[in-house]
């Protein structure tokens, strides 16, 4: 086998026909500036080809069901193994996916509980054992003497059909009576059942009267019934109750039998185990009165009912006015002045009481109705169920909240399933443990000799999988945590742990920044995991910017030298020491500290005002009070799972945004937020896409395209032709090419081959029709402008201040290499975040804006971080406030103020460990952040002195 993966002539995206030799069975880091071509090499070339070759080995029939990969633009690749990509984009948002199900730990738990779980009665809690025939006889003999009994075996339960064969079989076996749907019938009568109705059929085995001496006959009849009824017998007391006995599991005291205990019973995705009320979701989404009526001091006319406030002339408002008018109120009456009964009418409906409604409809027709008022909440529920529009559905969901299912209280499973325990814990209690707690629980579990034999293999798998999750720094996650709530880094590390669990050898793993979201403290464990995967006999290609990972790598490939068109070349390749010596490598310059991010000489003190969160206790936060100083650059730090995102995103952002705007979802639990009067805007700049379709691009998102279209409409040619700005939009009829509807490309479906995208034959990919493209500004068409990079745009629009301002800020945030018309779907998370940042920077500062960023360094090289920090510091210099959640020490050391949460993750986190300047935090021994910050601040002083 070859010792190298040899790539020849890679040209995907911006790669410049490069050749690379990657050593096999080694840990290889691919690094470089954001947009330099790292992912193009690792994912779009090497992974795509490895995956494509594997899929090509399957039949054409199988291929049509698999995600097809295009053949990458490369001459050839040798020495390639089957490739597995572990990226951050494939997080499941299915509400049924949990940490337990994704890691397959839940599958082993289901098996363990089914095989060695101890059943209890869901009603009285007593341990349940299987009933013997003797116990059944004793139970029946305790009934009042002379009670008449029917001993029956059920053979059909709730099935459609005429069941003629079944009835004929009963007749042949010599039985005289059957009970069909509760009615006892002589088997020799003509029985015609409705074909499309569900029927239940029991064979009457014997008829008895309770008295002394019948025990033997009763036992024989029970045994026959148990044999026919698969371990279950029904005893009908004539004119009395129906008793059920089971050879399987049943509570003798309560008369409750459990079905046969099988792994599927413990699955909340199976009808055998799922709570019937919520179908195993554990929650209900419903309209929340606090979101529908966020400010109860308002009147209906002032927007009391938020979902109805957008259209004050709607029929719903006419109805509300009619209800109020009847009782002497108006739309201008404040809510707290309206009688409680009338409030109830408005919220939940008037029942039978009717009202007169009169209004003019959209056709100017006068209409009158006399009917009850259904109520605002039922009206919203009805509209939500009836609408076919995704946009309307999404707008309604902004007023809904998720509440635990009233029946299972969020447990997702049936009561009889939750009554089965191991070590006095049911499966829900085990999955509510953190991974660290679950690992400890299983280590201390004691089994009988028989149980030990049964559980041995299952326990081995559980210990291994929990151990791998501990190794990648996820001990704070609970097994019941929804997969959709995980960050990209957490989801990636879970998949990494799952891969280690699979124990494959000779595989090519390609990872995308596995250190994201991981505190410096946990880095060594992650690196040990990566090395373990390598030592099994696998090749790891890791796209990464983290210095610790580079020092641990066997080989580093630095792609660059710049981003976009200025990148796509191999600048340097070798060990970390060789990269440090390479003067052309920007990575080497930062590793050797020839370049570095300086520690500020002094920290800002702020403007004296604060935003204070009081009594934060969502998730693991321990009722803490946190002050955020305004006018400074604040970084919230702490180990993974310490409560940073909960505090900043769920409480601070949602709490403030719900007061300033209408937002989706409720803020996390807290008492109050003080100091809201000191800000007028709060903006969360996250890494979600700037648009979900290729029609969204940086020019449309920032709003600069409006000014560009305006500029083109002012040219002489456009004025002569009467073209308005709308003519230069590729989204509407008029100026766009109608053959491709302004996309520039046409999709051709190839069924079991990948879909092919070809340039539109009419416009040749220009998006516009010929007439529109005849209008030029400085020799360029509107299509040429969309194909310009930001750097080119800066030069081209230098004399148009309105446009140049946007170009300059896009350049300042390090996006000079992207095209103005680059589809949003091709931008990375980090690029999308910086487009949003530029969009905000281009606006005039009010000095009262609070910006929130969650791990903005994701996907950024140290050089990009340097540039990003300059931009964030500019925002603060303008009087605004920036709050960042971050693990990157280069960002942490440049902050004015730090809030360090911890000390650990999960239940052992959620408190403030330290707060103050980075220098203050470095002195706190209990702070993990401080421990790593201290040497960095000392190094910063030395470097500042060196270059002074």
Pin down the residues of each PLM region.
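Conserved phosphate-binding elements of NTP-dependent enzyme cores
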Residues: 1-948
